[in-house]
Amino acid sequence: RIPHYNFSQYILERLPADCTTKTDVVEQILSTTRCHPYYTQQLAALVWDFLTYKKLDAAEVVEQAIATLVRTHDLDFERIWLNFNKTDRSVLMGLVSNVQLASNRRLPTSTVYSSVKRLMQSGYVIKLDAFEVEDPFFARWIRQRQA
């Protein structure tokens, strides 16, 4: 991960000059991506395109860019999702809903943590302050499926 301050300065310098709420836009980008370089690059590039070419309102541009990324990767996410077993899906749904892993009473604790270990080894889950789905756009896609 790149330090928040360094990343925010880098993005701020590159957003279009006519964007009046640059700081808010950058904060929304970095809070969504948690300063992960790959996901930040994806989101920031799309935000830049929307601000520069589509002249979208800065107040809504990040949310629209996220929705576009989720929609763009829908088939990829669906394919990934279908390859998970029922336990992995349950764990992922719990993680995106901020449910504590230990409080999942539908599955034995050892099963939950075996699933987390498997998902971490596959690169879908990481542990920062807590376990979470690494790809913020995949996490959003999972949340939308639950709704």
What are these regions (language model features)?
Residues 1-25:
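Conserved small helical "lid"/interfacial subdomain of P-loop NTPases
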Residues 2-4, 47, 138:
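Conserved nucleotide-binding/hydrolysis micro-motifs of P-loop NTPases
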Residues 19-23, 33-35, 39-110:
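Winged-helix-like regulatory helical subdomains adjacent to P-loop NTPase cores
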Residues 28-32:
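Membrane-interface alpha helices of multi-pass inner-membrane proteins
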Residues 106-122, 126-128, 132:
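Short amphipathic alpha-helical interaction segments
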Residues 138-147:
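Short, amphipathic alpha-helical interaction segments positioned at domain boundaries
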